Amino acid sequence: NSTDAAALVRPGCALDREAARRGTSVYLPEETLPMLPPELSERRLSLLAGQDRPAVSVFVSLADDGSVRRCSLQLSTIRVTRRLSYQDVDAQINSGGVFQRLHAVLMRSRETRLAAGASGISIPELQVRLSRDRRVVLSVRERETPAQALVAECMILANHSAALFLRDNGVPALYRTQKPGSLRAAHRRADLPLAERVRLRHAFNRTIVETRPRVHAGLGLDCYCSITSPLRKYLDLVMQRQLTAALQARGPVYSCEQLRDIAGALQPVLTRAALVENERRRYWLFKTMEPLRGQVMPALVLSRRKKHYTVLLRDYLLEASADPPDDGAYEPGRDVQVLLRSIDPFEGVISLSIV
């Protein structure tokens, strides 16, 4: 289920215009800048326990092998009886019951996508946030938990189901597409060495938003769109409007040309939002590392260039250039020690050398 934001945020209203201007919620270490006002995103439209909420529901019947037997999409009213944390669901998956069975079936569905060419590469992620007393808190997510994997597969399944519905009913839509790359199956495994996984991350073709339903190679699906985050992504809100109109047997809210115009206008907005997120995350990370100037830290060689190496600082999962040592040469995957010569949080500049 995803909350039916389209029921309250009408096309062209003041809320819609502001949401289009923002394009997305922006997540910074120090704060979140929501696309929609908190009164809506955190209260009136949030799936709070014990409250009736309009929703778009995707009903899917899965076989034991993870294949889809039946699927339907409906407008609904739902009431959450109990909100579960990821930790709650992890515990229930480990102890048996419905969540364990659901997780097992969804992991077979994931295996089917992987066999169709989806990427299984997972890279540790450094999370940077500020505590209430303005301390920088760093944490590393090594890999997704069973609960996170379950939720991810549910979202992919819901979005794929919506894309199939829109495509098969001839409804104008914005699809997320990705051309197949040149990676061999051996390069899509999750158990590759870290240096290889980081290097291959840059080898995938970029995802494109377009009105033609084409393959999304990175997910191993024949078509894909995104409808599950209408409170924080404007394109999801737009697509939810198209979907709800079709479910109500009304004409489409947007034509293909209008959708292309919306996607084109939104692209620089989303690019700028991603840049701000990356710059603020980098700033606070560099503030944490600033007292370490002149110290040596572990790194992993990713690649070698004519005049420098690209390394990954292991403790911070940060890719950066490093000057070569006075003698010797290192191949990708080699563990080395690097000297932090200088770092400037305001300019976002770091200087390293292999020692």
Model-derived features with residue positions:
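Electropositive polyanion-binding surfaces
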Residues: N1-R334, S342-I350
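Short, compositionally biased
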Residues: L352-V355
